[in-house]
Amino acid sequence: MKVGAAVFELPGVVALEELSFSGRTPFPYVPGLFYLREGPFVTEALRRLSVVPDLVLVEGHGIAHPRRAGLASVVGLVTGRPTVGIAKGLLCGEVSWDSEDTGWVTLDGERVGLAYRCGRRTYYLSPGHLTDLETLLELMDLTDRRPHELVRRAHRLSRS
């Protein structure tokens, strides 16, 4: 498995540091237990960075997860860093669209995330660790409604 990490300064999306590394994972993919497979690699990537990020975006869910603790939540707990999850699919809950391209993800009557459309794709943001729904709105503002671009850059590093 190969993982990538990138640190940006916002606003302006200035790249400060990028890295990638690979290793073997002893765990198979198990739906809902993504952390067992990906978590150790994500936390190791964060450990290897020389720049300590103020906020970590994780490709995976935060509290918009059946256990209310997805990959972003667990990575935050393990590292002690504030995290936000960003995912391309909704694991649980439902979206109530406030506008054509933005809505809230609710689970058991509680807001647990933000959904937004960019082009034909829908993305789902949810607080992980030491963050809240307000953090999601601030992130949307700081990235011109494109936080997925930051995660995509790190994802590309894992594919190179």
Question: Where in the sequence are the language-model features?
Answer:
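Glycine-rich loops and low-complexity Gly/Arg-rich segments
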Residues: 13-15, 29-33, 80-84, 109-110, ...
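Catalytic-site beta-strand/loop segments enriched in glycine and acidic/polar residues
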Residues: 43-75, 79-81
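Solvent-exposed, flexible loop/coil residues
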Residues: 25, 31, 67-68, 109, ...
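A glycine-rich, hydrophobic loop/mini-helix early in the fold
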Residues: 1-52
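Flexible, glycine/proline-enriched loop segments at strand-loop-helix junctions
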Residues: 29-33, 59-66, 121-127
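C-terminal binding/interaction regions
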Residues: 14, 39, 44-46, 89-90, ...
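A contiguous pocket-lining binding segment that forms or flanks enzyme active sites
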Residues: 65-110
